[in-house]
């Protein structure tokens, strides 16, 4: 496991940003993902690509930070694959993957399925590396080995950051219901999902 800047978070992140020519945020970003060197490197790369030297204001919430990160990946991948980042191809891929994780695949999806899913989104499949390989290389997705009994030892692909996965899964759940209070109430769709899978047992 990679522990990033753990134990020296603010000092190490500040030094890294300085080396990248990026000003540190005016307000501390407390999300643990911000202490991960790969996460921070991706954000800095996107800023430099846009000729920016500072982070936008308002990254203090998880939602704003993750949206900024996805936008960063989107711009980097769009440049490599020659498409318009406003097409939101990467975001569409992540939403599609998240929709297939619940309820039985929270650890990840079979690699061959994810490769096919991602490459179906590729607007320029004959240009450069495959979209699947680029997303793995950029670190937004990771390859792993399944430990589920029926798939033990098989290669799977998952979101690199667990909270990032949680964020997209939560968005998918909420987007599928008309009234959130009913979905969480006794017998509602989300209530039933949590109950059946024992996600919140006390």
Identify the meaning behind each predicted range:
Residues 2-179, 184-195:
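Extended hydrophobic
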């Amino acid at each position: 496991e990679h522990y990033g800047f753990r134990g020296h978070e603010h000092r190490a992140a500040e030094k890294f940003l300085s080396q990248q020519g990026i000003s540190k945020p005016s307000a501390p970003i407390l999300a643990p993902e911000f202490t991960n060197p790969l996460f921070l490197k991706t954000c800095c790369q996107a800023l430099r690509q846009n000729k920016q030297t500072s982070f936008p204001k308002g990254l203090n919430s998880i939602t704003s930070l993750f949206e900024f990160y996805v936008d960063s990946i989107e711009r980097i991948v769009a440049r490599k694959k020659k498409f318009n980042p406003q097409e939101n191809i990467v975001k569409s891929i992540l939403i599609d993957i998240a929709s297939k994780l619940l309820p039985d695949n929270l650890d990840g999806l079979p690699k061959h399925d994810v490769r096919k899913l991602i490459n179906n989104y590729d607007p320029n499949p004959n240009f450069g590396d495959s979209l699947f390989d680029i997303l793995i290389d950029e670190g937004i997705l990771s390859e792993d080995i399944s430990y589920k009994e029926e798939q033990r030892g098989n290669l799977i692909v998952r979101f690199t950051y667990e909270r990032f996965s949680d964020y997209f899964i939560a968005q998918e759940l909420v987007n599928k219901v008309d009234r959130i209070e009913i979905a969480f109430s006794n017998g509602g769709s989300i209530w039933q999902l949590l109950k059946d899978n024992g996600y919140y047992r006390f």
